[in-house]
Amino acid sequence: MNQEEKRVFLIEELKKESSVMRGIAVPKEEEAQKMLLRGLMNVRMAKPTSLSFQKVQDEYLQTETENKGITKLSSLSPVAVIPRAAAPDAAPLCGDEAADSSGSEHLCGDEAASASGSEHHTDAFLYLWQGDITTLAADAIVNAANSAMTGCYIPNHRCIDNAIHTFAGVQLRQYCHAYMQEQADKKGASYAEPTGQSMLSPAYNLPSKFILHTVGPIVGDALTEEDCKLLASCYTSCLNLASRHQLESIAFCCISTGEFHFPNDRAAEIAIRTVRDWLMKHPSSTVTKVVFNVFKNEDLEIYRSLLQKT
């Protein structure tokens, strides 16, 4: 099957799962077909698929990503070098009060654990990259998740959670659902993933190896010190978990900006400061390459300006 035939096959298979969608005609236009397929994947609940569906889906998604163009970390140039010989005192994140951004981490039932790595001390490198994070070949990319952790169910929504779940494939929602079920069995049926923690999953059909899912703070009428601490905890927790699994490279999206209303400039300040301080405090960690991934030109300029001062 070519890409169009695979796309139509997947649409027809997903239509069979829903009595509401069965009567919908498959459009002839390529972009309309892509939107329909993505929408059907977005609203699909977590449940097993047939082997034939998964095989075709995997081939289709991997080809789509290849056609968009995969960016390898080796093609990027670092914008800052972080020497890792000593650990400085961390600066306060908001206001005058120093913030504790230790965070915690989750991996399908495992409790928080300290970062680990080799005994060899090496410099770390920061990168700034504007592009689609679902096309980046890093050891791990970070997903700005919500507390339900099973992805965005709004058809064709433009959030990063939707994009990552779409192009990873339906297996990712199943994995995240199983994780949430396990947590609910341990901690109660109403369990929601706490803000500032992280969970590691396979990346399935993405060019990265893993996905780090973290729930950022939702800012209300005004930014608070607690919001800043929780955002820092997202970054720290992801770095701890990446180090624990001996990963070398991690790409952060702009956590909590956009839908969660964290001011872009303050979010960037916290992101860079927290990552820099963590890298300097963990000279033996395997994590040596950190990418700040931006999508909007506004964020590109903010990060570029701040990183020039690093």
Question: What positions do the PLM features span?
Answer:
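Macrodomain-like recognition of ADP-ribose-binding/processing modules
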Residues: M1-D96, G109-T310
